[in-house]
Each structure stands twice: as structure tokens, then as C-alpha cells.
Amino acid sequence: MTYIKTKLKRSIDIDAIITLHYFEYMKNFEFKGESHNFWEFLYVDKGTIAVRADDTWTTLKTGDIIFHQPNEFHAIKSIGKDSPNLVVMSFTCDSPAMDFFIRRNFTLSMEERSMISQIIIEARQTFSTPMHIPSVE
């Protein structure tokens, strides 16, 4: 029998995960902001928040995700009546395909939301650091 190799194309190759958190913010939470030399995405699992990317504020609600490129200043604040639950993942990636995500936010499909949930489940089984404490790196 002859075996045929199928070469895999790596459009986006994440080199390292820096942080991965899932937590519930207080209703009146405000984070004044930061910037760093790696990518970060913020996914709203529940609630409504305002997100700053450099000088632009955007409102995100349940199911929305935003990407912050390296060295982009970003901040968040809770703006809804309920405490928001957020997933924050930061990572290093030099893939040119990541340019697609610069200054972009999206509403995820149910299948994509399920994938985010799977990432959290896998992370809880893989990493020893608590995911619900934002200051833990």
C-alpha cells in the first residue's frame, strides 16, 4: 500500500500562550488599560462592556470578540446592568494572516462560541494557575 502525505498549511501559528483567563467582572469594573508586545483577544461570554483600542471605544455584548494587536493600548469597563463574564487570552504569533484581525471585532457563531468553551475546558485541565484571577500571569 502506498501512503500519501498531506502537507498541512499553517496559516496562523501561535508560538506561545501568555495568559488565559475566564472570570466575572464586577458591574462597575473599569480597567484603565495597558499595552504589551503580544496579541490578546477578549471574548464576552455574558454581559456588555466597552472596550478601548488605542483611541477608539467599542461596545461588545454576549458572543462578541475583539483582537488587540501587539503594542495596541487597550482598556475595558463594564457598562451593562449585569456583571460581565469574559475570556481573555494573550499569545505570541508572527503569522502574517493575523493582520486580518487588526482593529476587528466579530460576533461569534454558536459553533465558534463552543470552541471558546472547549479552549477553557482544555486550559483548566492543562494549566495549574487559576483562570479566574485576572492578576495571575
Model segments located where?
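Ligand-binding loop in jelly-roll beta-barrel domains
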Residues: N71-D99
